[in-house]
Amino acid sequence: MSTKPKMECSESGVSRKNESRVNSIIIPISDWSVWGMGVPSEQADVKFIDPLLRRRLSPMDRSALHVANVCLEAHERVHLIFASRHGELSRSTALLTEIAKGEPPSPMGFSLSVLNAVPGLYGIAREDTSPATAISAGEATFALALIEAASQAWRNPDATVLLICADEPPPPIYAEFVQSPREPYAIAIRLEAKRAVCPVRCTWTPAMNCGEIEDVIHSFISCLTSEEKTQWAGPDHLWHWQRDYGQI
């Protein structure tokens, strides 16, 4: 006769099986904002950024900083997490093209092409020197970034954690290798362990089925806007999201 592994829940919002492998966590969401992904969106508003700095922003920078600003009060300090599957791929492609032509790459272009460029621009724009994290994990970038954000929120219950995930379609030269996302998007999620108004339980189980990046964002947004349990089949795991008001 087989027995199911017992689950242990702690105040950290994490559930563990008896073999100590984490397989679920509560995401303590207090606010969120999305740009793109089929949601009616105007041009990303970044008027809060100094004009000199604003001129350096790429379209992805603008959308990422826009959704972040919507979720925050003026002069509010947060632990920032920026996640992107491709990052500033358009800038990187331009730099590689310059190098291939034997031209010196632009120092400014290089400094803005790295994955942590958005956190850096955010810190400058809002004069916030709080810790920042940058994550890129292939197709599972958004799902794994949620775990990182929730973990930081539970580890620092008095702090505000802000997750920004943004991407744009890869340049045509990469079409043979990757096509997603097909449209630019940005989503910001504010997490607060003590002030969550929309706690979501995230559960993952081993699976082999690659899902599209658009599907994971749509699936999570559906969970936030409805009472339904949603799921996404990632490259190595099946992810489930469900509201869990028992954690408030």
Model regions and ranges:
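Conserved "HGTGT" condensation-loop signature of ketosynthase/thiolase-family condensing enzymes
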Residues: 1-140, 165-248
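Short aromatic-hydrophobic micro-motifs that form the base-stacking/packing surface
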Residues: 162
